[in-house]
From Swiss-Prot:
GO cellular component: plasma membrane
NCBIfam families: ATPase_P-type
Cytoplasmic topological domain residue ranges: 1-66, 116-245, 294-555, 606-622, 686-697, 748-813
Ranges of the Extracellular topological domain: 87-94, 267-275, 578-582, 644-664, 719-726
Major localization listed first in the record, in broad terms: membrane
UniProt-annotated location(s): Membrane
Source species of the chain: Arabidopsis thaliana
Name recorded for this polypeptide: Putative ATPase, plasma membrane-like
Annotated residues for binding of Mg(2+): 500, 504
Origin organism lineage: Eukaryota, Viridiplantae, Streptophyta, Embryophyta, Tracheophyta
Keyword set, alphabetical order: ATP-binding, Magnesium, Membrane, Metal-binding, Nucleotide-binding, Phosphoprotein, Transmembrane, Transmembrane helix
Length: 813
C-alpha cells in the first residue's frame, strides 16, 4: 500500500502524459496493479485526489439572487407604476410608491423562498442519478458510485456504460466508443488495449477492463454532468406558453390604458392626476407578477412528488410533455418482462447423437462470463450444478450489438482447445430455450393505460394469419428502426419512449419524453428526460397521472391569472369611464398583497381528479377560459357598482344604508366585492366537476378564509383618508357576500359550457375508444406472449380491429 508521501508523489507524476506511456509504466507511476486497489488505499487516495465529479457551480450570493428576482420583465411594469405614482399621483403618491415597493419586496421574498425549496428538490433528484460503475477493490468486483474512483482503480466497461473517468484499456479485444459529444467524430471509434478512453464517452460495443488515470476536474471533459444540465435547461413549449400569457396580460393592460387615456384625458378632459391613478389601478391589479415563479415552483414541487413515487425528472419541463403523451412506445425486456432469464432444461433440443443436454448447458455456460454477468450469462451459469465448471483458461470475444453474438475460446483439462458461441441466432435459442416471463402486473398495467388515455395496443407480427393487427413490428428491431418509428409517430402524436439499453439512446433523445427504466444503462439514463427507480409499468402510470395533476395545477393558475387581468382591466375601466368613479390604487394594492398568500397556497394545492386523457397547456383553452371568466366577473362588478351607487335596490331589499353619493363607503364595498370574487374563482377553476363535489386543498381553503376574513374586517371597520375609504358595517358586508355567492354559481355552469365548446364531441369519442381497447384487451389472457418458432416472433396482443380505427400504441421486442 502506498504511503501518504508516495500518494503526493503520484499526484505530481499524474501531470505526465499517462495516456501515451506504455501500460506497465502507468502501473508503476500510479503504484497499482491489475488486481486493483484495497478499500483502505482507495479511501486514502480519495483524500488526495478528491471525489470523481465536477465542482458544483458556486451559488449566487443571496443579494444578487434577490435583486435578480426583483428585476424581472413583469416587475419592470410594476416598477414603472411606482415611478409614476411618485412623480404624477396626487399628494398620496409617496405612500403609494412605498406600497408598490412593499408589494415587490413581498413577492420577491416569496419567490426567493420557493425557488430555494425548488433548488433543494432538484439537488435531491440529481443525487438519485449519481452514475455507477463496477470497480475492483480488495480483489472483488462491486458496483459503486463513480464518485469514489481514484487513479489506480481497475474498472469494468461494458456496452451502455458512460465511462466515468479517463482510463487506459487493459487486455482484451476492442471497444467501440462513441465520443462524438467530446470530439465531434461521427460514429463509434474503435479502441484497443493500451489506448485511452475519456470520461463522458459511451461504450457502444465490447467489454474490457481499464485502469483509471484521471478523475473529476482532472479528466479531459465533464460531459456526464453536462448531459444532465443541458436537458434540465430545455424549456421549449413551456417557456413559449408563459411568454404568450404574459404578452396577453400586458396587451390587455395596454389596451385598457390606451382607452382610458383617450377617453378620460382628451374626451372627458379629466384631471391628469386622476388619469394617472386610474392607470395605476390597471397596472397594479392586472400584472400577474408572480406567475413565472409560481409555475416553475409548481413543476419543481411536482417533481418532488414524482421522485417519491419512483420517478426522477432530469428535465423539469418534461412534466408538461409527460402529461401530453398519447402514444407510449415500450421496450420489451425488463419492462413488459421481468428481465430474469431462466433455462427450461425440459425444452432443450439436441441435434447431435453424441451430445447430451448437460453438455449443451456446459458449452453455453463456458461461453458466459463468471464475473460481471449479464442476465443471459447468469441464466446459463446458474443452470450448472457447480458454477465452477464454467471456467478454464479462456480468450473472450465480447458481445457484439451488430452480430448479437459472443464467443469464448477455452482449454479443457486434456489441453484440447474449444470455441463456443452464444447469441441470438435462432438455432442457438432453440438449443437453450431461454425464457423471459411476463410480469404479473403487465395485464392490469396495460388496462390502466387504456383507461387513462395511454392507448397501448397490438404488438405482434404474424406471417400466416387472417388477423388484422393495428401495429406490427418484427422481432429484434435495431436502433435505427426504433428511431424512425418514433420520428413517424411524432408527426401526429406526443410520443413517449421507454428504454433501457445503449441501442435505445437515439430513440430516447428523439422522443418527446424519453423514459429510462430502473437499472437502465448509464447511456440510456443520460439520454432520457425521466428516470424510473422502480421496476415495471405501474410506476409509469403513477408518473403519467402525477404529471397530469401537475399540469392541471399549472393550467389552473394560468387561467386564474388571465381571468384576474381581464376582470381588473375591463371592470375598473368601465366604472371609471361610465360613472367617472376613480377606484383607489391603494385598495388594488391591498388586494394584490393579500393575494400573495393565496398564490403561495396554490403551489401547495393537490389536484385530486387529474384529466383522464392526455393534456397540455393549450393557449387557446387558457385564453378562451380566462377571457370568459374575466369578462363575466367584470360584468358582475360593474352591475354591483351600478346597483349600489346609482340605485336604491340594496337599501329597499335588505334595509341597508344608501351608498349613493358616498364615495368612501362605496370604495370599501367595491373592494370587498372584488376581493371575494377574485379568490373564490379558484374553487371553480381547480375542479373538473362541480366545485362543491371536489374539495379544495386544506391549505388553499384556509388561505381563502384567512384572507377574506382580513378583507371583510377591513371593509367593515377601515377609515383611511389617504385611500379614500370608510367602513361599511356588517350589514353591507353580509349583502356583498350574498351577492357574490349568488353570482358565483353561474361560473360553474360556464365552465362546462366552455369545455364543451372547446372539445366538442372529443370526450365521447375517447370514451368509445377506451371501451374498444378494453374489449380487445380481453383477448390478452388467451393470446399473450406466444412464441411462434416458425418465424420467431412474439405476440403480446392479438387484435382483430380494422386498421382504420384510430388506435394509438406501440411496442417492440
Amino acid at each position: 500500500m502506498a504511503t501518504g508521501d508516495s500518494l503526493e508523489d503520484i499526484k505530481i507524476e499524474i501531470d505526465d502524459d499517462l495516456e501515451k506511456i506504455p501500460i506497465e509504466e502507468v502501473f508503476k507511476k500510479l503504484r497499482c496493479s491489475r488486481e486493483g486497489l484495497s478499500g483502505a488505499e482507495g479511501k486514502e487516495r480519495l483524500k488526495i485526489f478528491g471525489p470523481n465529479k465536477l465542482e458544483n457551480k458556486k451559488k449566487e450570493h443571496i443579494t444578487l439572487r434577490f435583486f435578480a428576482l426583483m428585476f424581472k420583465p413583469l416587475s419592470w411594469v410594476i416598477q414603472a407604476a411606482a415611478i409614476m405614482a411618485m412623480l404624477f399621483a396626487n399628494g398620496d403618491g409617496r405612500q403609494l410608491f412605498l406600497g408598490i415597493v412593499c408589494l415587490l419586496i413581498v413577492n420577491t421574498i416569496i419567490c426567493y423562498l420557493k425557488e430555494d425549496d425548488a433548488a433543494n428538490v432538484v439537488a435531491m433528484a440529481r443525487a438519485g442519478l449519481s452514475p455507477k460503475t463496477k470497480v475492483l477493490r480488495d480483489g472483488k468486483w462491486s458496483e459503486q458510485e463513480a464518485s469514489i474512483l481514484v487513479p489506480g482503480d481497475i474498472v469494468s466497461i461494458k456496452p451502455g456504460d458512460i465511462i466515468p473517468c479517463d482510463a487506459r484499456l487493459l487486455e482484451g479485444d476492442t471497444l467501440k466508443v462513441d465520443q462524438s459529444a467530446l470530439t465531434g467524430e461521427f460514429g463509434p471509434i474503435t479502441k484497443g488495449p493500451g489506448e485511452e478512453v475519456f470520461s463522458g464517452t459511451t461504450c457502444k460495443q465490447g467489454e474490457m477492463e481499464a485502469v483509471v488515470i484521471a478523475t473529476g476536474v482532472h479528466t479531459f471533459s465533464g460531459t456526464t454532468a453536462h448531459l444532465v444540465d443541458n436537458r434540465t435547461n430545455k424549456v421549449g413549449h413551456f417557456r413559449k406558453v408563459v411568454t404568450e400569457i404574459e404578452n396577453l396580460c400586458v396587451i390587455s393592460i395596454a389596451i385598457g390604458i390606451s382607452i382610458e387615456v383617450i377617453v378620460m384625458y382628451w374626451i372627458q378632459r379629466r384631471n391628469f392626476s386622476d388619469v394617472i391613478n386610474n392607470l395605476l389601478v390597471l397596472v397594479i391589479g392586472g400584472i400577474p407578477l408572480a406567475m413565472p415563479t409560481v409555475l416553475y415552483v409548481i413543476m419543481v414541487t411536482g417533481s418532488l412528488r414524482l421522485y417519491r413515487t419512483g420517478t426522477i425528472t432530469q428535465r423539469i419541463t418534461a412534466i408538461e410533455d409527460m402529461a401530453a403523451i398519447d402514444v407510449l412506445c415500450s421496450d420489451k425486456t425488463g419492462t413488459l418482462t421481468l428481465n430474469k432469464l431462466s433455462v427450461d432444461k425440459n425444452l432443450i433440443k439436441v441435434y447431435s447423437k453424441d451430445v447430451e443436454k448437460e453438455q449443451v448447458l456446459l458449452l453455453a455456460a463456458r461461453a458466459s462470463r463468471i464475473e460481471n454477468r449479464d442476465g443471459i450469462d447468469a441464466a446459463m451459469v446458474g443452470s450448472l450444478a457447480d458454477p465452477k465448471e464454467a471456467r478454464a483458461g479462456i480468450r473472450e470475444v465480447h458481445f457484439n450489438l451488430v452480430d448479437k453474438r459472443t464467443a469464448l475460446t477455452y482449454i479443457d483439462g486434456n489441453g484440447d482447445w474449444h470455441r463456443v458461441s452464444k447469441g441470438t441466432p435462432e438455432q442457438i435459442l432453440d438449443l437453450c430455450n431461454a425464457r423471459d416471463d411476463l410480469r404479473k402486473s403487465v395485464h392490469s398495467a396495460i388496462r390502466n393505460y387504456a383507461e387513462r388515455g395511454l392507448k397501448s395496443f397490438a404488438i405482434s407480427w404474424f406471417r400466416n394469419t387472417n388477423c388484422n393487427t393495428v401495429f406490427f413490428f418484427p422481432y429484434q428491431l435495431c436502433s435505427e428502426h426504433k428511431y424512425h418509428i418514433v420520428n413517424k409517430l411524432q408527426e401526429r402524436h406526443i410520443c413517449g419512449l421507454i428504454g433501457d439499453g445503449v441501442d435505445d439512446v437515439p430513440s430516447l433523445k428523439k422522443a418527446d419524453v424519453g423514459i429510462a427504466v430502473a437499472n437502465a444503462t448509464e447511456a440510456a439514463r443520460a439520454a432520457s428526460d425521466i428516470v424510473l427507480t422502480e421496476p415495471g409499468l405501474s410506476v409509469i402510470i403513477d408518473a403519467v397521472l402525477a404529471s397530469r395533476a401537475i399540469l392541471q395545477q399549472m393550467k389552473h393558475y394560468t387561467i386564474y391569472a388571465v381571468s384576474i387581468t381581464i376582470r381588473v382591466v375591463f371592470g375598473f375601466m368601465f366604472i371609471a369611464l361610465i360613472w367617472k368613479f376613480d377606484f383607489s390604487p391603494f385598495m388594488v394594492l391591498a388586494i394584490a398583497l393579500l393575494n400573495e398568500e393565496t398564490t403561495k397556497a396554490i403551489t401547495m394545492d393537490n389536484v385530486t381528479n387529474p384529466s383522464p386523457t392526455p393534456d397540455s397547456l393549450k393557449l387557446k383553452e387558457i385564453f378562451a377560459t380566462g377571457v370568459v371568466y374575466g369578462s363575466y366577473m367584470a360584468l358582475i362588478t360593474v352591475v354591483f357598482f351600478w346597483a349600489a351607487y346609482r340605485t336604491d335596490i340594496f337599501p329597499r331589499t335588505f334595509h341597508v344604508r344608501d351608498l349613493r353619493g358616498n364615495e368612501a363607503e362605496m370604495m370599501c364595498a367595491l373592494y370587498l366585492q372584488v376581493s371575494i370574487m377574485s379568490q373564490a374563482l379558484f374553487f371553480v377553476i381547480q375542479s373538473r366537476s362541480w366545485f362543491f363535489v371536489e374539495r379544495p386543498g386544506e391549505l388553499l381553503f384556509l388561505s381563502f378564509v384567512t384572507v377574506q376574513t382580513i378583507a371583510t374586517t377591513l371593509a367593515v371597520y377601515a377609515s383611511w383618508e389617504t385611500a379614500r375609504i370608510e367602513g361599511i358595517g356588517w350589514s353591507w358586508a353580509g349583502v356583498i357576500w350574498l351577492y357574490n355567492i349568488i353570482f358565483f354559481f353561474p361560473l360553474d355552469i360556464m365552465k362546462f359550457g366552455i369545455r364543451y365548446i372547446l372539445t366538442g364531441k372529443a370526450q365521447s369519442l375517447f370514451d368509445n375508444m377506451v371501451h374498444l381497447v378494453l374489449n380487445s384487451y380481453a383477448k390478452l389472457s388467451n393470446g399473450i406472449y406466444n412464441h411462434t418458432q416458425a418465424d420467431h416472433t412474439y405476440s403480446l396482443l392479438e387484435v382483430s380491429t380494422p386498421p382504420s380505427q384510430d388506435l394509438r400504441g406501440v411496442g417492440w421486442v
